[in-house]
Amino acid sequence: MSQVCDICGKGPQTGNNVSHAHNKTKRRFMPNLQKVRTQLPSGEVKSIKACTRCIRSGAVVKPVAKKAVS
């Protein structure tokens, strides 16, 4: 499963775990991705993976909720 934001392209970064003895082992810092339904400019509603920064900045347009038929 790809860990890349569909809007900004943010992906995993590499770094080190550092123990108290200063031993270093490689690790990956993953972006905080959320699966969210968004409305594309064409009007189509699609589910994408977006990082929380894109969601908070307003780059993700939430679709208008459908009204229940009664």
Swiss-Prot record:
<keyword id="KW-0687">Ribonucleoprotein</keyword>
<dbReference type="GO" id="GO:0005840">
    <property type="term" value="C:ribosome"/>
</dbReference>
<dbReference type="InterPro" id="IPR026569">
    <property type="entry name" value="Ribosomal_bL28"/>
</dbReference>
<dbReference type="InterPro" id="IPR037147">
    <property type="entry name" value="Ribosomal_bL28_sf"/>
</dbReference>
<dbReference type="InterPro" id="IPR034704">
    <property type="entry name" value="Ribosomal_bL28/bL31-like_sf"/>
</dbReference>
<dbReference type="InterPro" id="IPR050096">
    <property type="entry name" value="Bacterial_rp_bL28"/>
</dbReference>
<protein>
    <recommendedName>
        <fullName>Large ribosomal subunit protein bL28</fullName>
    </recommendedName>
</protein>
<dbReference type="InterPro" id="IPR001383">
    <property type="entry name" value="Ribosomal_bL28_bact-type"/>
</dbReference>
<dbReference type="GO" id="GO:0003735">
    <property type="term" value="F:structural constituent of ribosome"/>
</dbReference>
<dbReference type="Pfam" id="PF00830">
    <property type="entry name" value="Ribosomal_L28"/>
</dbReference>
<comment type="similarity">
    <text>Belongs to the bacterial ribosomal protein bL28 family.</text>
</comment>
<dbReference type="GO" id="GO:0006412">
    <property type="term" value="P:translation"/>
</dbReference>
<keyword id="KW-0689">Ribosomal protein</keyword>
<dbReference type="GO" id="GO:1990904">
    <property type="term" value="C:ribonucleoprotein complex"/>
</dbReference>
